[in-house]
Amino acid sequence: MKIISSTHLKELDKYTIANEPITSIDLMERAAHELTRTIMRRWDASFHIVVFAGPGNNGGDALAVARLLSQQNYRVEVFLFNTKGKLSEECQINLNRLKECGSIYFTEVSTKFDPPVLTEKHLVVDGLFGSGLNKPLNGGFAAVVKYINASKSPVVAIDIPSGLMGEDNTYNIRQNIMRADVTLSIQLPKLSFFFPENEDIVGEWELLNIGLKTEFIETVESSFFTTEEVEIRNLIKPRKRFAHKGAFGHGLLIAGSYGMAGASILSARACLRSGIGLLTVHVPIHNHDLMQSTVPEAIVH
């Protein structure tokens, strides 16, 4: 699977809208349905949902999810942060739709924010900022993130934890980044998911396929890929019924040193695991008996 930049992800959205064709708000609704189904699979209706939505399209996703969860009899509370008095077009549409749901407790935050009580029975839906963020969170947004991080509530992030950038986080402020238990990434993973320092920020991540156009992804150049099961499966050829070890290649492994036989043993086992027919291993004399006893299939010299 190809990993593309946040800029290319935006272009992927635009390409899908133009070539499916589908409107931006309908594509957002499709994503919201996938997000909602996944949240419902992981957390039942005993959880009190608390949605934190930002002014952009990530916030629009969050508002749509809030509406859909409410329709499934979840208790939902929404905080929309609109400190500049301007929402994206899709966020505004989903706000209008949300207001038609009378069962949702809704607060629009423009200045002062009185945070709700958060316990382990509340599920925080993080929809403050998406992968397009290009600077660290500060001020009020950083304070909100710190408040949520200090709570005992599980957090599910929409697309990416708020405050985490899609690629380079060298100059980011780590204490101002949302720490998610689960991240529901739309269509493709973000490069920052694969850095060990972000493990406790991203948590467990799951990809949600919302039908973005794969032909665009194929045209984008990238240096980063993940290896998927389907790609490996195509490399494994069916074996003939009467085939024998002589039909599957003969490998030579030269490895090991005195007192450090582990790497040579693991390498030999890996060779055999790959399906090779015969394996000859050359090791130092001190490792000969150990190799022969632990990897009896190998021809040891």
What are these regions (language model features)?
Residues 1-80, 88, 182, 193-301:
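Small-residue (G/A/S/T)-rich helix-start motifs and N-terminal tracts that mark the onset
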Residues 36-128, 136-158:
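Nucleotide and nucleotide-moiety/phosphate-recognizing core
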Residues 81-84, 160-161, 188, 284-287:
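Short, ordered loop/turn segments at secondary-structure junctions
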Residues 104-111, 138, 163-168, 232-237:
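Short gly/ser/thr-rich secondary-structure transition/capping motifs
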Residues 121-123, 128-224:
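Internal gly/pro-rich beta-alpha loop/helix module
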